[in-house]
């Protein structure tokens, strides 16, 4: 190295390791409308100051690395770096903090949830300075939202396609989830749809197994849909699961569904991946298919309360990537979901504008700038006695999905569907008449059961079934 080169290097670059907080902790920073904002729950290792931990998150999820590098001088770090601009302790928790991080929009590829998550929830989650890290919420700026198509159709377009208004939609997951032949599977679909349900559903792990190949299932389910439509005069659907081992195979299944003339297909968006999901959502919009989304694997990511990612973030990501329905818990069934927290991300799925509300776990005001909404699906351990609570909690713009609560009826599948439809119609009518579903729910169901033997039988079977456990979420 020449003396001249040595002089320039010594002036422009100083090698070594320095604290992240010297560069990435900027409490005076004023956030921009175009920034992506993140709220992380940070648990530092013993001896690591919270400022250093928050700055480390900002650095490792944006432009930083473990040591100073000379190529930092070839760009403007001030323009591209993430910034930890706020810290607050978590009430009731020892050594946990909410770290607020702002990311410049130029860090992210347009229209790519995959790229956004690769940065924000990538390698930083394995960082040694942190005992645990959880992404609680994201604020997606309107400038970035406008680069996404979002849901293929949205709530209003779906209602218009189905010609169904003023009530939640009713669904049922076909059980047993694995093992039925395609013909017997189609028979169960037909019986449920004929009995009064709007939709039936493939279970999330039904793809194309030796006992039932996908093409056979699609054909028998299409026959069931058209037969039940002819008999009831209502538009029906079955969520045909197009999830597959490759994107090419997934698209082939979606194309076949469109050729059959069915109204809706399905995708497991977390196991299938956001790239595949966005591709399928684009195809569904272009070809008039509704898209039902299942969240299989979500609890691996969101169940631990100090590490991972809250489902509200996955819900926002799904609205960007695309889906007309997504499973969102029940509050009252067998799967975990605290009421206020669940309603917080349900509103984030459906509404155009949601105000910051920490009591519901919403850390940032979110403006969706007319991106279509997503119907939340309540599913998991629910039955007719839950109908008043579900109708009150989720309102009209939702799908209430009863699997065992339909197919477990003592008289069979069609009577199980009748019982659910009668219970729903009774609850909607009572609500419209001004009755209090929370207080009078059981009475409303009993009154309706006097005129419906199917509902009376269902009420008797499930009168003692409850799923009561302590909620785990903390704000």
UniProtKB/Swiss-Prot annotation:
Binds 1 Mg(2+) ion per subunit. The modification N6,N6,N6-trimethyllysine is found at residue 14. Its EC number is 4.1.1.39. The keyword Transferase does not apply. Mg(2+) binds at residues 201, 203-204. Substrate binds at residues 123, 173, 177, 295, 327, 379. Residues 1-2 form a propeptide. Keywords: Acetylation, Calvin cycle, Carbon dioxide fixation, Chloroplast, Disulfide bond, Lyase, Magnesium, Metal-binding, Methylation, Monooxygenase, Oxidoreductase, Photorespiration, Photosynthesis, Plastid. Pfam families: RuBisCO_large (PF00016), RuBisCO_large_N (PF02788). The disulfide bond which can form in the large chain dimeric partners within the hexadecamer appears to be associated with oxidative stress and protein turnover. One of its GO terms (cellular component) is chloroplast. The basic functional RuBisCO is composed of a large chain homodimer in a 'head-to-tail' conformation. In form I RuBisCO this homodimer is arranged in a barrel-like tetramer with the small subunits forming a tetrameric 'cap' on each end of the 'barrel'. Belongs to the RuBisCO large chain family. Type I subfamily. PANTHER family: RIBULOSE BISPHOSPHATE CARBOXYLASE (PTHR42704), RIBULOSE BISPHOSPHATE CARBOXYLASE LARGE CHAIN (PTHR42704:SF16). Heterohexadecamer of 8 large chains and 8 small chains; disulfide-linked. The disulfide link is formed within the large subunit homodimers. This is Ribulose bisphosphate carboxylase large chain. It comes from Glycine max (Soybean). The gene is rbcL.
